[in-house]
Amino acid sequence: MEERMLMFPYILNLLAAMLLGALIGAERQWRQRMAGLRTNALVATGAAVFILSSMTTSPDSPGRIAAQIVSGIGFLGAGVIMREGMNVRGLNTAATLWCSAGIGVLCGLGQFKNALAATIIILCANILLREAAQRINQLPVSAEGEKRYILKVTCNKEDESEVRQWLLNIVKEAAICLQGLGSVPAQEQGYKEIRAELVGHADYRKTRELIISRIGDNDNITAIHWSIDSQ
């Protein structure tokens, strides 16, 4: 009987961590993210387990264990972050996992009220701030901001390396940041399409005119296409 009484606080802490982690994960699951209900519940529960085990073996070390948990979650969060061209996806999901670990730490320490308050705030951040971010994205772009552009040029495949180097020199001259450079076979046989991913000032007209006018002087280039990256 005494052993059961001793186990009750341990189980209560783990259940609280699992439930609050699942609550955070439910929102991620609803939005069809990679790390959903189960992942967040397990992260919170695991963090609570580490805290509880450290308190059992060395009651003075939960702070040190909490710091180790933060480092460990970094590896897990990196697994949900993906780069697609110039776009990075999964940052919010990784941050949510990090927060779930924090909830688990609070539950492991028995700070249930703090854990519940933090869970509510995390959910508000993921739900309410999402709407705010979408509204901000719909506002006119600041002239002082940056935009992403896609520049595509088509050339004969034998001239690809020369055109690539020439393109790099022009981009450097235009003082615009090159984020990526690659090539794929063009629709016309024997030709290559070189794709440059650029980041520059939102007022891009002068930069675009400079790049296109310089490219137009190269006889090896048969087609040019400039567009704003809408992703």
Curated annotation (Swiss-Prot):
It comes from the Bacteria. Pfam families: MgtC, MgtC_SapB_C. GO terms for cellular component: plasma membrane. The chain crosses the membrane at residues 5-25, 39-59, 62-82, 103-123. The keyword Membrane applies. It is a multi-pass membrane protein. Belongs to the MgtC/SapB family. It comes from Salmonella choleraesuis (strain SC-B67). Coiled coil: none annotated. The keyword Transmembrane applies. Keywords: Cell inner membrane, Cell membrane, Membrane, Transmembrane, Transmembrane helix, Virulence. The lineage of its organism: Bacteria, Pseudomonadati, Pseudomonadota, Gammaproteobacteria, Enterobacterales. This is Protein MgtC. It is found in: Cell inner membrane. Virulence factor required for growth in low Mg(2+) medium and for intramacrophage survival. May be involved in regulating membrane potential by activating Na(+)/K(+)-ATPase.
